[in-house]
């Protein structure tokens, strides 16, 4: 939440789970809520991943729209991707999904009307299990 525009009454901020809010406005900490102020003059993804590394966070799930996901993919900041494709839904318009680079298909599973494709980043294939 770069400019802290999200309403504070969202469940995201209820402090039931440890939450980190990366932003350009403030640095503050509560029980399970950390506001981490980023340097607006630096690469945001580099700064976020460095901060997470320093906090010893070893796994991150990135959920977002195509622009957010494409940013992580473009910087090579992904190890695994799960792509869910609904085989029965037809949309006339919409946003294009991100384009994955260096992907290796590991497996596919069918779940109801969905196909779940598991990809790994080909750059790291030696360490994948």
Locations of regions flagged by a protein language model:
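Residue-level signal for pocket-adjacent positions within structured domains
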Residues: 1, 7, 85, 93, ...
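Short amphipathic alpha-helical segments
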Residues: 11, 73-76, 94-96
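Active-site ligand-binding patch in enzyme domains
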Residues: 1-58, 67-70, 125-128
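Non-catalytic surface loops within mature trypsin-like serine protease
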Residues: 25, 87, 121-123
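Helical hairpin unit composed of two closely spaced alpha helices linked by a short loop
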Residues: 57-60, 64, 74, 82-84
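Conserved histidine-centered catalytic loops in small-molecule metabolism enzymes
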Residues: 93-129
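Small/polar glycine-rich anion-binding or flexible loop at a beta-alpha turn
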Residues: 64-71, 88-90
